[in-house]
């Protein structure tokens, strides 16, 4: 199931891909189906409702209510969700080596990967409002001499947990985004 968030007629909507360039407006379809017990107004609310919400969306897709369909040429893609928090993990050694080499080149200070990086996951907290939608224009800050463009993959956590066993980890992932 491919979910997203779009702006359609000046309103943000959660959508699900029906086929190729056609999406289902999830909230509109739910309202027409009388599903007042679910809130599909934004992706975060959908995630917080868990597996039951996904089952309801599958049901709505099966209904195929065409008056709730939206064409891709009618929308502006938004970030799939605005996360409550954002942690970026540095997990690719080659990327980190390249980043440190660039930092060394620009600053004259020698940067090396610290030994702890090989022992435990290292992350930084990013700006949760820095995400953009598919095909969005990336703003180049006037004070910057170059852009560091990266393709990121996000694992979106769907339920709370602590000290989760490796074999159970996938049960806590709602989905992925690029």
Kindly label every feature range from the protein language model.
Residues 1-37:
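Low-complexity, small/basic-enriched stretches
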Residues 4-6, 11, 38-178:
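Active-site microenvironments in enzyme catalytic cores
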């Amino acid at each position: 199931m491919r979910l997203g968030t779009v702006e359609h007629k000046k309103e943000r909507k959660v959508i699900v891909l029906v086929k190729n360039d056609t999406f289902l407006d999830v909230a509109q379809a739910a309202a027409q189906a009388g599903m007042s017990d679910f809130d599909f107004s934004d992706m975060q609310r959908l995630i917080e409702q868990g597996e039951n919400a996904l089952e309801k969306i599958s049901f709505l897709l099966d209904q195929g209510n065409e008056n709730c369909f939206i064409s891709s040429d009618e929308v502006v893609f938004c970030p799939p969700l605005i996360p409550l928090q954002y942690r970026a993990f540095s997990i690719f050694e080659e990327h980190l080596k390249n980043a440190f080499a660039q930092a060394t080149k620009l600053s004259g200070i020698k940067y090396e990967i610290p030994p702890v990086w090989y022992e435990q996951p290292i992350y930084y907290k990013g700006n949760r409002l820095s995400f953009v939608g598919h095909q969005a224009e990336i703003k180049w800050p006037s004070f910057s001499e170059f852009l560091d463009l990266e393709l990121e993959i996000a694992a979106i956590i769907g339920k709370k947990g602590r000290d989760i066993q490796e074999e159970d980890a996938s049960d806590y992932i709602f989905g992925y985004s690029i």
